[in-house]
Amino acid sequence: MEEGKQFRLTFSSVSGKKVEADFDGGVVTSDSGVLLAREMDRKIGVIDCLASALWDRRHPSYVSHSLEDLLRQRVFQLVCGYEDGNDSDALRSDPALKIGCDRLPLTGEDLASQPTISRLENSPSRPDLYRMALAFGELFVASYKKPPKEIILDLDDTDDVVHGSQQLRLFNAFVDEYCFMPLHIYEGHSGKLITTILRPGKRPTGEEIAAILKRVIRFLREAWPKTRMIVRGDSHFSTPEVHDLCEDSPRVNYVLGQAGNKTLKQLGKPLMNQVLKDAEDTDQSVRRFTKLDYQAGTWRQSRRIAFKAEVTQGKANPRFVVTSIRNRSAKFIYKFYCARGRMEGFIKEHKNYLKSDRTSCSRFEANQFRVFLHSAAYVILHALREHALARTELAKASFETIQLRILKVAARVRERATRVDLHLPTSYPFKDLLRTIVMNLDTA
């Protein structure tokens, strides 16, 4: 009996006829949209750039799959929503994925198996990972046709809960779980990824944040000497080390949340009292802003604070933002700070849609490598949305929507003497959209 016939599925009948399914449909893929990711990567060179950062320690005589092939296979699986390395066994013969990895769908050699992918993930050394981090910086810089006048360095961390005995997993009392706490840095205007650094499961100290930021700023400054940079983050990034680093770096400013304390609340008390009175008189929410000058005991100098005095539903809601920008109003600074809410969306796409919290390797370096693989998938999907989906109904779509509508498309694959044909479903509802995307890719 043929393998596909062994798994016959039975459903409710329709019009008196049995409804059955099997896996004997022939050479059909569920992910023909991976070819879009392939075309995008050929234009921006994510895989080649990352592969050049790795040192292949394998004996050349025993290598069946190059580093480029392995990276391409693993990253394209992530792009299509297959976050588990074990999926490689089921997908190594997938015709669309083989085309994506520059192999013929039927006569080409199958892709790597799960054990080979596992060896790949455990092979990078710390110098390899450092070079990969630099490669992401190079990809970020190359994504601009000319140096931008201004970029925003949005930084935030997120909990990555683990359930094993991974190296450097720590118990985090706030999360109430053992976890990692990876640091994400994106460009705030565009959502482009700059870097993702896996960290132990605790809040970073000011020295740790400043050490990472210093490398990022130095790298970008070498590429763009005249570009203005603004570091933006919430209150646990507001440390003397970060303030001093930004103030000592040319054309670098910061806008950071500042935790309230007795001194700050006392400085803002006159405005807060006025807002409380106005809210009581009008029985409405009231919000006002002002600038304050404040110097904490650990700060080397006084700094500007944008203070928001707000009363909502009868309750006071004071908020403070510290900044090195002195020629803007407090209201502007606060609104600029609040715009960092987009950062949560960037992390959501990286962590939830691309499943970058699958850090289940024992070695810390292997888990950092996994995070970088997910970051590569993020860069490809972001570029696809920015260039190929521009001016379409998916121009602002989430990665999840992009996967469902244009990547998860079934196709029958035929390999001929001089070409490869993919026959997509006649009932596919987004034909015109797909044509537009392919045309945009041609001109990207």
Where are these regions (language model features)?
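Short, surface-exposed basic-aromatic patches at helix termini and helix-loop junctions that form
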Residues: 243-252
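Dynamic "connector" segments at or just before major functional cores
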Residues: 1-204, 208-223, 248, 385, ...
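Acidic/histidine-rich, metal-coordinating catalytic segments
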Residues: 156, 227-238
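Short, glycine/acidic-rich hinge or "gate" loops at secondary-structure transitions
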Residues: 90, 104-106, 228-230, 389-398
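Short amphipathic alpha-helical "interface-anchor" segments enriched in bulky aromatics
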Residues: 40, 88, 330-369, 373, ...
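Basic, amphipathic alpha-helical segments enriched in Lys/Arg and hydrophobic/aromatic residues
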Residues: 356-427
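An anionic, glycine-rich sequence signature occurring as long contiguous blocks
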Residues: 2-23, 253-352, 438-444
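Short acidic (Asp/Glu) and glycine-rich catalytic loops that position anionic groups and cofactors
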Residues: 13-19, 50-54, 95-99, 313-317, ...
